[in-house]
Structures are given as structure tokens and as C-alpha cells.
Amino acid sequence: YRNYDSKEDVLVTLIRDVLELFRNEMKEDPAGLYSYDNVVLSFSYFQKYRKYILDLYHSGFAMAILEEINHFHESVEGTMPSSSIEKYKLYMYTGALFNTAIVWLSEENPVDAADIASFFFRKIKNI
């Protein structure tokens, strides 16, 4: 921990490490992160790291998680010119993904990751 200035720096590094693992498993698809396979992968990762995510969320680090997810999606999908209204698509998606994941993970007996991913994909596919 000597190389970090704060606890948050340590947590952000851990979040980034998980996102890099995700990047290595992503499916190549013209739809990018919005593809069905990558939505399923997203929810499987949320499920795999459920305790870690919920601990961070309940400790007040939800924005740190969301900001890192936003940065990750920007790095994968690219950014739009600041004058383009289309830039909001990415943030609509990441916000919906993260919020849905938190509510889903908070349930005592959450539905299967594939089921929530399928539901999410059907509802979000027009974004």
C-alpha cells in the first residue's frame, strides 16, 4: 500500500484490475459492449464479484465504481465529440447497467445472471 495515496486509490486499482480481466474475456462483436454476449459477460462478472461490489457500494464507493465503468466503456467504445448528443448513449447504458446490477445483486436470492442479462438486453437494445 506504500504506492497509494489513499484507500480509494487502492480500491480504484482493484476495480481497474477486474475491468481488465473483463476486457480479456470480451467477445469481438460489431455491437461492442452492447452485444448480447458482452451483456451476459457483464452480469456474470457482477455476480462473480458480488460481495466485493456490494461492500464497496454500501461503504460509499458507488461513484468510484461507476466512474471506472464509465472510463472503461469510453476506452472500449471511444468517445464522441463533446458537441454530439450521441455521447450520452454510453452513459445511459453504463448507468442502467450499474443500477440494475446493484438492485439485482442486493436481492437475497437474485435470478440467474443469464436471465437478468437477457431481460436487460431486451430492454436496452434500442439505446
Residue map of PLM features:
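Hydrophobic alpha-helical connector segments
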Residues: 26-52
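Short, residue-level hotspots on alpha-helical faces of the histone-fold
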Residues: 13, 17, 59, 67, ...
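Short, structured helix-loop boundary elements
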Residues: 8, 12, 16, 32, ...
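An amphipathic alpha-helix adjacent to DNA-recognition modules
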Residues: 1-27, 47
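Secondary-structure edge/capping motif, primarily at the C-terminal ends of alpha-helices
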Residues: 29, 53-56, 104, 108
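Hydrophobic alpha-helical segments that form the core
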Residues: 85-107, 111-125
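Amphipathic alpha-helical packing segments from all-alpha helical-bundle domains
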Residues: 58-95
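Short amphipathic alpha-helical interface segments enriched in basic and hydrophobic/aromatic residues
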Residues: 23, 27, 47, 74-77, ...
